[in-house]
Design a protein with these regions (language model features):
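A structural signal for isolated positions on well-ordered beta-strands in alpha/beta enzyme cores
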Residues: 19, 45, 90-92
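Conserved beta-strand segments of alpha/beta enzyme cores
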Residues: 17, 43-45, 112
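Hydrophobic packing residues within well-ordered alpha-helices of enzyme cores
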Residues: 5-9, 31, 44, 74-78, ...
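Conserved SAM-binding loop of SAM-dependent methyltransferases across substrates and taxa
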Residues: 2-16
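Short glycine-rich anion-binding loops that position phosphate/pyrophosphate groups of nucleotides
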Residues: 1, 69-72
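Short helix-capping segments at alpha-helix termini
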Residues: 12-14, 36-41, 83-86
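S-adenosyl-L-methionine
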Residues: 21-62
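Class I S-adenosyl-L-methionine
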Residues: 54-59, 63, 72-201
Length: 201
């Protein structure tokens, strides 16, 4: 996103070099300008390309970050460039939604989630997945809530799913009593969340 992340990582001494890929001309030009403004043209190469087309195996990339888009789109990007990931040791993924679909794709393509984080900003919640190659099996709950996030129960995680319970409770109040199937579906979703949060009914 405008090369902000590689610029920050270089300034903090966490990486040695980076390729910043942008698919749209405007952000591409913005990224070029930001890199130049920080005097990092020799460390960050900005490329106009779609997804993993921004790099080649000869670039010897060890870590790829894809952030700020839906989980399904991230999975599509990874699928389109799957053959390029053989020598990439780590993925850092930040889906804005459909986190469960992304986790399912990763498991089905022999990737394992080694760590997760969640943060809240401006009343929005963002989950971050750190992924490496390797087999992993996840339960349906782990796919939805995140295996590490479930275990760690960070304040932002509890806040996110507590808000979801509030939304579902409100939706349940709007469903007529005679509509048992809809009510049962909502009640089941509420129960699953409360079980993960260790909250009694």
């Amino acid at each position: 996103d405008h090369a902000y992340l590689p610029i920050a990582l270089l300034q903090e001494g966490k990486i040695e070099a980076a390729i910043a890929g942008e698919v749209v001309e405007g952000p591409y030009q913005s990224a070029l300008q930001n890199v130049a403004d920080n005097g990092l043209e020799d460390k960050i190469e900005v490329r106009l390309a779609n997804g993993l087309a921004a790099f080649e195996p000869t670039d010897c990339i060890s870590c790829i970050t894809i952030a700020g888009m839906g989980g399904r789109l991230i999975a599509d990007i990874l699928a389109a460039g799957l053959e390029k990931l053989a020598n990439v040791s780590r993925l850092v993924l930040q889906p804005n939604n459909r986190e469960d679909e992304l986790r399912a794709w990763l498991v089905n393509h022999d990737f394992r989630i080694i760590d997760e984080a969640i943060l809240e900003e401006n009343e929005k919640f963002y989950e971050i997945l750190v992924v490496e190659q390797g087999s992993q099996e996840l339960t349906s709950k782990e796919l939805r809530f995140g295996p590490h996030l479930m275990r760690e129960q960070a304040p932002a995680f509890v806040q996110k799913w507590s808000k979801e319970v509030e939304k579902l409770d409100f939706a349940l109040e709007q469903v007529p009593v005679e509509n048992q199937s809809a009510r049962a579906s909502l009640e089941e979703r509420i129960t699953h969340i409360k079980e993960v949060l260790h909250v009694s009914k």
